[in-house]
Amino acid sequence: MRLCICFVLLAVIVCASADNPFTRGGRFVLDAAGGAWDMLRAYRDMREANHIGADKYFHARGNYDAARRGPGGAWAARVISDARENWQGGVSGRGAEDTRADQEANAWGRNGGDPNRYRPPGLPSKY
């Protein structure tokens, strides 16, 4: 009986530590949820800062934070960024040039670039 229990425990430990599709899928979902939270946090900070010219910085920072979580976070950042730009492109009337610049900042952050490249002068250090 003890040998059987030991065997079952060993089997559970081996299966739990294995790189299986369920573990990877679960990690992807958790990364995506965390990435969505990172994007929301960057949006809230942008609204709170209310600083002229800071939108590109917050775009890059949200994508950067989300992508650092892993493939799920990078996927969430890409989906959210693309959806936001597609929606804003038709509603805000800011133009194609601004949308292109936003997408450049999104890609910069998502690819691991330092968001401070887009940091405007005078933005409080808390951001």
From Swiss-Prot:
GO terms for cellular component: high-density lipoprotein particle. Pfam families: SAA. Its main location: secreted. This protein is the precursor of amyloid protein A, which is formed by the removal of approximately 3 residues from the C-terminal end. PROSITE patterns: SAA. Expressed by the liver; secreted in plasma. Also present in the liver and lung irrespective of induction. GO terms for biological process: acute-phase response. The keyword Transmembrane helix does not apply. InterPro entries: Serum_amyloid_A (IPR000096), Synovial_Prolif_Regulator (IPR052464). Residues 88-127 are annotated as: Disordered. It comes from the Eukaryota. Induction: Upon cytokine stimulation. Keywords: Acute phase, Amyloid, HDL, Secreted, Signal. Residues 1-18 form the signal peptide. It is found in: Secreted. It is linked to Reactive, secondary amyloidosis is characterized by the extracellular accumulation in various tissues of the SAA protein. These deposits are highly insoluble and resistant to proteolysis; they disrupt tissue structure and compromise function. PANTHER family: SERUM AMYLOID A (PTHR23424), SERUM AMYLOID A PROTEIN (PTHR23424:SF29). Major acute phase reactant. Apolipoprotein of the HDL complex. Belongs to the SAA family. This is Serum amyloid A protein. The lineage of its organism: Eukaryota, Metazoa, Chordata, Craniata, Vertebrata.
